[in-house]
Design a protein with these regions (language model features):
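Secretory targeting and sorting signals
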Residues: 1-30
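Oxyanion-hole/transition-state-stabilizing segment in secreted/luminal serine hydrolases
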Residues: 47, 96-158, 189
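Structural recognition of the beta-strand scaffold that forms the well-ordered cores
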Residues: 35-40, 44, 77-82, 111-116, ...
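Catalytic His-Asp segment of secreted/periplasmic serine-dependent ester chemistry enzymes
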Residues: 188-289
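Short amphipathic alpha-helices and their capping/turn segments at secondary-structure boundaries
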Residues: 24-37, 95-114, 167-181, 283
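Charged, often glycine-rich, active-site loop that binds/positions anionic groups
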Residues: 86-103, 248-262
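Conserved N-terminal glycine/acidic-rich loop preference
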Residues: 112-115, 138-174, 183, 187-235
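Serine-esterase "nucleophile elbow" of acetyl-processing enzymes
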Residues: 31-84, 103-104, 132-139
Length: 289
């Protein structure tokens, strides 16, 4: 059974109190620290959020990503192997030369694992945003040219390929860390539910394709949730809390940077505010104080 997070933290605090009252305390009374491993793709790595972790520039891993925020606020011992562009297959195989499979960081002593994964399988995010952005520019923002051209193709790939890949990856993760609490985060909203005035300049998606793109993300999050629940993982749902913080919103409100005229070198990804909010909502979902 996964170790209850609150129990681990309470035990840690109790150990500290007892050690103060005992002379010659042995190592058995040492403070217990949460062993935390962060896995996943660029939404977990915080790609585009400065400063960048200099230990592995290929992964564009930020030192201000949500796993670092969680670790700083809880005092957990963090091993962060998140990597921009990661797919589910990179849990079990190297993504780049010198970058080990992400599951290598997990052991049977791991207490907590967090991750986002699936958006890069089939290149879903980049292909959908690029295709709809190009179609939007050519149409001057009118109609639904992306939906008209691609139909259910993105959804078909998500269902046929992404869902089973995520489920299999989570099963391997649980096998490696049978005592860990595993939290799988959904992706915060990229687009609003419908087209908004003034957004086309920042996110050039045709008005009829805004709900189409949102629907693709809804489906992706749904299969992530299904895979999480079917493997005994905790799904952290961002559908409600991230509503109204999409890439169309102004700086200071949006959690996701737009395709154009944003403040990040990596567009259509969480900014620093988004990473902090992802950390806070994940901590709430897990009962981390």
């Amino acid at each position: 059974m996964p170790k209850p997070i609150r129990y681990v933290m309470c035990a840690s605090a109790m150990a500290g109190v007892l050690s103060l009252g005992l002379t010659g305390a042995t190592s058995a009374h040492a403070t217990q620290t949460l062993d935390y491993v962060a896995l996943g793709d660029s939404y977990s790595a915080g790609s585009g959020v400065l400063p960048v972790d200099p230990t592995n520039l290929l992964c564009l891993r930020s030192t201000a990503n949500y796993p670092r925020v969680i670790a700083a606020r809880t005092g957990a011992h963090l091993k962060d192997v998140t990597c921009g562009g990661a797919q589910t297959k990179h849990f079990s195989e190297a993504q780049y030369p010198g970058v080990a499979p992400q599951l290598d960081a997990v052991t049977d002593g791991t207490d907590l694992v967090t991750l986002t994964i699936g958006g890069n399988d089939n290149n879903t995010f980049i292909n959908a945003v690029t295709a709809c952005g190009s179609a939007g520019l050519l149409s001057g923002g009118k109609g639904s040219p992306c939906k008209d051209k691609h139909g259910t193709s993105f959804d078909d790939q998500i269902e046929a390929n992404t869902y089973p890949a995520i489920k299999a990856a989570l099963q391997r993760l649980h096998a490696k860390a049978p005592g860990a609490r595993i939290a799988v985060l959904g992706y915060p909203w990229i687009t609003p539910a419908t087209a908004e005035p003034g957004c086309f300049a920042k996110l050039p998606i045709a008005s009829g394709d805004v709900p189409y793109l949102r629907g693709i993300q809804t489906h992706l999050n749904a299969v992530v949730q299904r895979a999480a629940e079917e493997t005994g993982s905790t799904y952290v749902d961002f559908s409600r809390v991230s509503d109204g913080h999409d890439a169309c919103k102004p700086t200071g409100t949006r959690w996701i940077e737009p395709l154009l005229f944003g403040t990040s070198v990596v567009p259509v990804h969480p900014n620093a505010l988004g990473e902090r909010r992802m950390a806070e909502h994940t901590m709430d979902a897990l009962g981390l104080d």
